[in-house]
Regions:
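Conserved GNAT acetyl-CoA-binding A-motif
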Residues: 49-74
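GNAT/GCN5-related N-acetyltransferase fold signature
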Residues: 9-11, 28, 106
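A conserved beta-strand-loop-helix scaffold within acyl/acetyltransferase catalytic domains
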Residues: 8-18
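C-terminal "cap" of GNAT-fold acetyltransferases
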Residues: 20-22, 92-127
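Short, small-residue-biased leader/transition segments that mark boundaries at the very start
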Residues: 2-5
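Conserved catalytic-core motifs of GNAT/GCN5-like acyltransferases
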Residues: 8, 60-62, 76, 80-99, ...
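Conserved acetyl-CoA-binding loop-helix of GNAT-fold acetyltransferases
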Residues: 34-51, 72-77, 81
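A short, internal acetyl-CoA/4′-phosphopantetheine-binding micro-motif in the GNAT/acyltransferase core
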Residues: 25-33, 61-65
């Protein structure tokens, strides 16, 4: 059977002042959950971003007031387990499956903020 896995990291906001912040996203096939793969992907992304000089990591997460058959609180719990903390809630921000969901932002600081911050290094692919 095939398994679908996708991960990405991109600039948090498209302005130079936010170059040191990155939003992370991973999507795992249902069969790939609860086996440590998500943690490994996030840790690899965070390590690469830290090497580039990124300081702040963010995750935008759909969050139900009450869990239902479409959305649970697992993603928020996963991020908290990885050291992210809740830094913002947008009430009833997302609408899908004929219902409203909150959107939460979670943050993890992975580097030291200085007054003379070095520029973020561009991404370079290497195997």
């Amino acid at each position: 059977s095939e398994m679908c896995i996708r991960d990405s990291a991109h600039a948090f906001v498209g302005r130079a002042a936010y170059d040191w912040a990155s939003e992370l996203t991973i999507y795992l096939d249902h069969n790939a959950k609860k086996c440590g793969l998500g943690r490994k992907l996030y840790e690899a992304l965070a390590d690469r971003l830290k090497d580039m000089g990124v300081l702040n990591l963010y995750a935008c997460i759909g969050y139900p007031k009450v869990e239902d058959e479409y959305l649970n609180k697992n993603s928020a719990q996963f991020h908290e387990h990885l050291g992210f903390r809740l830094c913002g809630t947008f009430e009833n921000c997302g609408y899908k499956f004929n219902r409203w969901y909150d959107m939460i932002w979670m943050e993890k600081i992975i580097g030291e903020h200085t007054l003379d911050q070095a520029a973020v290094k561009p991404y370079s692919y290497s195997e």
